[in-house]
Amino acid sequence: YILEIPRLEDDKRYLLVNILNLKTEMVLSKGTKNKDNGAGKYIILYRDEKVPEGYEDYIPIRSEDSRNYFIIRLESYGENDYGKANAIQDQFVMRALYPERIVERESLPDGYNGQSYFMTQMKPAEFIRRLQGTIADTRHDETMLTYMRQLRLLDPAFSYEELPEHLQKEIASGFEDGLQAILQYSGTEGYESNGWHAYIDSVGEYGRKYRYRAHINYFAVMPNLYSDTISPNLETDSDGNV
């Protein structure tokens, strides 16, 4: 897969581009913490696959897993900035290296569990631990820090078991809701915009109440480097609407 990240003129605008494998290990992380906002041309290859002819000027990134998550978060400064933020978004390029191999589907194949596998493995306690690990990325935003402060997540020693019982239940039910939404997804709700495939669905009560998306354009897709297929994941707009 090809990923081209544009250079941002505004170096204060938050940008995070992550590629994670199916075990959520980091394959690539670029953004405002990197030189030139991580701008550049990248080619994501499966294991020891050779860089194809004509792509020698691309930076090779290798993944041990065939299925990977591509996630982009781009900050906007409110409604008056949406036009500029969307124009930046349109400069991103993500496309299959061999698009002629891709066969379009009206729905996901029977037995598909690409996303649900990880959700059934990750427990709520692990979710809280990972959420605590995002503090460094959200220190610039007082809204998110306020949420985390209310949940006592700024204390690295704090654990899921110490949350009030009603919050533990909301998190657990949110996991179940999210899993069922994935398992019941027909594929017909999908759409394509500038090469990004997405779908719209419920993320559960916990996700609706506590998931931080305000003023962040959020895109995620799951391409398969081995079979040249792509599965829909999630998209939100700058107001956090899924």
Question: Which sequence ranges carry the predicted segments?
Answer:
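A compositional/structural signature for long, glycine/proline-rich flexible linkers
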Residues: Y1-V242
